């Protein structure tokens, strides 16, 4: 987790600060794999579909709370925490990487990471999704897991087994091999050098209104009916 990244506007804002020293020392790395907002204050991302479009897997009621309250709450709190600080000039991913592991910056890290993760989650879903991937992604899945059914089972088992709050992820390692991992709380696999392709949110607020304690039913429904394979393929190609 030693790599750090900063956007070009940060050099001006960080002049004379400790963060500037980090930049000049080369501790902040190259451009982000995914860029979810370079301009602050950050805003709640626009969903790529109507808030009713994921029914019946995810209800409008859940979307209202999850997207409209929880996700928005992370955005608002992040803006509050970074106002008038050097972080206000940084991209979202740069903030996450710069604050990861720094206990004095835990509130900033948690909110920034949750904004990033939720942005990624909404893009990991699409109405009428699921089904079968194609092209190179399908080949990679077969190579890594045997076949699509085995992938689905492993993805489900991994996400469902996450203790407490967290996320299930399909990722690619540095060699391009696909893996399934889980992270707790606000953590994300790109902090460990893995490229996220898809994610499933297994915080209770993602499913409890619709599924109560039946996390497995929620996860399996998302995998079968909502996964956005086009998004995964785009990420794999980056």
Question: Each PLM stretch: what is its role?
Answer:
Residues 230-235:
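Low-complexity, Gly/Ser/Thr/Pro-rich intrinsically disordered linker/tail segments
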Residues 61-75:
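Structured secondary-structure scaffolds
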Residues 38, 53, 77, 199, ...:
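Histidine-anchored, small-residue-rich loop motif
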Residues 157-213, 220-227:
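An amphipathic alpha-helical core segment
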Residues 25-56:
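C-terminal segment of N-terminal export signals and the immediately downstream linker at the start
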Residues 53-57, 98-103, 184-187:
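Acidic/His metal-coordination segments adjacent to aromatic residues that form catalytic metal sites
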Residues 1-19:
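N-terminal secretory signal peptides and thylakoid transit peptides that target proteins
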Residues 37-41, 69-72, 80-89, 94-180:
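All-alpha RGS (Regulator of G-protein Signaling) helical domain and cognate RGS-like helical scaffolds
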